[in-house]
Structure formats: structure tokens, C-alpha cells
Regions:
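Charged catalytic cores and adjacent phosphate/nucleic-acid-binding surfaces used
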Residues: 2-16, 23, 27, 44-178
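Short beta-strand/loop segments at the ligand-binding rim of alpha/beta enzyme cores
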Residues: 29-37, 89
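Aromatic-lined carbohydrate-recognition surfaces of secreted/lumenal glycan-active proteins
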Residues: 37-45
């Protein structure tokens, strides 16, 4: 769910979450017995203070996102620190925009049984760890191109995209760190 405080994941929900308001979205998720997890909270900004109103309502934080560090290189590290300071469970996710990215980020859970309730309990008690590998930068560039085409972007936007795509290709070729 896209909200004014960022993206929010609703886990274990049975129905749609039809709102852009963070607080209403959390209420709907919790009303369905779900978990509200803040997704890639530092992808665009280092400002953790903006998230303070959200903390008491959250069930966890996505601390490994295979795409988040494209815009802010230490986004995942900042998310992990935030989760630790706020004492919130940690989650991992792919944020897949294409089939090749599925499974690049994930949450390993140590549950007593293979039931939704057992997994949910394990997640809330911190019996999980976020893991993954970084998505190729080219996939981020490609999804941005698709977004521009869908929204009827202006020609200058494509020039900016070309520079971003070149940067992404260079990262895929030369950057070795994860």
C-alpha cells in the first residue's frame, strides 16, 4: 500500500486495503488479523524522525530489500538500525518488478508448525531473519522505463532515464559489493 509515510506491506490479509492513508491502512490490516510491515523505509530519505508516528502501530520493518539501495546506497543498513532501535521484527523482500527478481529478498522463519498462525507468531516474536541478494540494477532501469511509457512521460524524462540506465549498467558491470 502506498501511503504518505511510505510503502506498507499487509501480511496475512484476506481483502483489499483501499486507502492511501497510513493510519487507516494499518487499521484495515490489523482489522483483518494481518501484520503491518513498513517496506524499504529509507529508499528515498535518511530521515527516520518522519517515521516516529508509525512506530507504535508497526508489526515489523523490511530491513532487506533487493532494490532499495538503488537510490540511497545504505538504505537497508539504515532500515536495520531503525528496526533495532524501535525493537521491531525484521523482514526481507524482493520488491520484484519482473520475474527475474522474485526471491532476491526473503524472510527466513523458524516456526513451530507450517500454519499461518505459527508463522505469524514466529515473525512477531523475532524468530526470523531477512536475507537476499541485490537485484541487478538493469531491472530497476527497465521498470522505470515501463513506468514512463505507462504514464506518458515527457521527452526530457527519457533523457534522464537514459542517464539512469547507463549508471545502472555500469553498476551491474563494475560494482561487486552486496
Amino acid at each position: 500500500v502506498s501511503t504518505q509515510l511510505g510503502h506498507l506491506l499487509g501480511l496475512f490479509v484476506a481483502g483489499p486495503v483501499d486507502t492511501r492513508d497510513f493510519f487507516q491502512a494499518v487499521e484495515i490490516i490489523h482489522g483483518q488479523g494481518g501484520l503491518a510491515v513498513l517496506a524499504h523505509p529509507f529508499e528515498h530519505s535518511r530521515d527516520g524522525a518522519r517515521l516516529a508516528p508509525a512506530v507504535p502501530l508497526l508489526d515489523g520493518v523490511e530491513v532487506w530489500n533487493s532494490r532499495a539501495d538503488r537510490k540511497l546506497r545504505d538504505a537497508n543498513r539504515l532500515a536495520a538500525s531503525f528496526a533495532q532501535v524501535c525493537r521491531l521484527p525484521c523482514f526481507g523482500g524482493s520488491d520484484a518488478h519482473c520475474p527475474q527478481e522474485v526471491g532476491n529478498g526473503y524472510t527466513c522463519v523458524e516456526a513451530d508448525a507450517l500454519t499461518a498462525q505459527a508463522v505469524k507468531t514466529a515473525l512477531l516474536s523475532g524468530c526470523a531473519r531477512a536475507q537476499g541478494t541485490r537485484s541487478r540494477a538493469w531491472y530497476a532501469a527497465r521498470s522505470q522505463l515501463i513506468k514512463r511509457r505507462k504514464t506518458g512521460a515527457k521527452p526530457l524524462s527519457y533523457v534522464k532515464w537514459a542517464a539512469f540506465a547507463a549508471k545502472c549498467c555500469a553498476q551491474d558491470i563494475f560494482w561487486r559489493g552486496d
